[in-house]
Amino acid sequence: MADQTNPWDTAQVADTTTQTADAWGTPAGVATDGGSTDWLNSAPAPAPEHFSLLDPFHKTLIPLDSWVTEGIDWVVTHFRPLFQGIRVPVDYILNGFQQLLLGMPAPVAIILFALIAWQVSGVGMGIATLISLIAIGAIGAWSQAMITLALVLTALLFCVVIGLPMGIWLARSPRAAKIVRPLLDAMQTTPAFVYLVPIVMLFGIGNVPGVVVTIIFALPPIVRLTILGINQVPADLIEASRSFGASPRQMLFKVQLPLAMPTIMAGVNQTLMLALSMVVIASMIAVGGLGQMVLRGIGRLDMGLATVGGVGIVILAIILDRLTQAVGRDSRSRGNRRWYTTGPVGLITRPFVK
């Protein structure tokens, strides 16, 4: 036993040091677990999961999300300059449409659009277009409507330039059509919001990425209906043209495309409607126009602002739908009259045409 009066007793010093180091005051008789020094991580290890036929999908079997993420990251790393180069023609054409539509005074643009509608679809449609465009301007949505129209027209132009030749090629190559058709199905059934993430990573945000995602979303209808229209041309007409010595080019431009034009224009109509709907959804990636008004109205709970944008979208959709339907009428429904003998153009040319 240590002497309590001896200050040099080492046993007493060691005992005091041990008590001082034990900050938690653990009693001497209590045994401590040497393996649980890290008390923050001392939770028991989870039990291993075993595959069960009753619940086979409890754990992810195919890590598709990580595969897609890694694939997109690889594409962005290696091909982003290529996609930035694709922006150039889209940006050029979009700026041209915007400068044209926004540069014209509103009364001039309204009269011009009304005359075009009269020429394409008759005087009734011309009057309806005039009243509708005046209504868009009266509710304070004119400039935003012109931006939306520029976006839609740009996307429609690229869809026609890409989709029409692709449809002709696939109509002539059934083997290629079997390969491309599942891709068109995927493009048409994929939710519109899914396109936004990779487009933002590859192109950024703004009007140009909005046009690109609109082109991707709205392209399948014109391709499908071009294939359908060409395949529906009667076989006896094709045989008759071949018997008269028509070349493949003459067969295409003088027989197949004219007879398939109503179906192709139905595809243009569907593409136009999808483009208009996608431009509104693309407002989430900073695309301007009427869709941005709707998005701001939703974000601020401003029912008035959202209603103005929605009414403008509805009016534009109705006008564009009726005009493309009128263009798609075949010659038999319009009669034997030439286009330049009707409408406002006919009023000007009538004195000079016998």
Swiss-Prot record:
The keyword Membrane applies. It is a multi-pass membrane protein. It comes from the Bacteria. One of its GO terms (biological process) is carnitine transmembrane transport. It is found in: Cell inner membrane. PANTHER family: GLYCINE BETAINE/PROLINE BETAINE TRANSPORT SYSTEM PERMEASE PROTEIN PROW, GLYCINE BETAINE_PROLINE BETAINE TRANSPORT SYSTEM PERMEASE PROTEIN PROW. This is Glycine betaine/proline betaine transport system permease protein ProW. It comes from Salmonella typhimurium (strain LT2 / SGSC1412 / ATCC 700720).
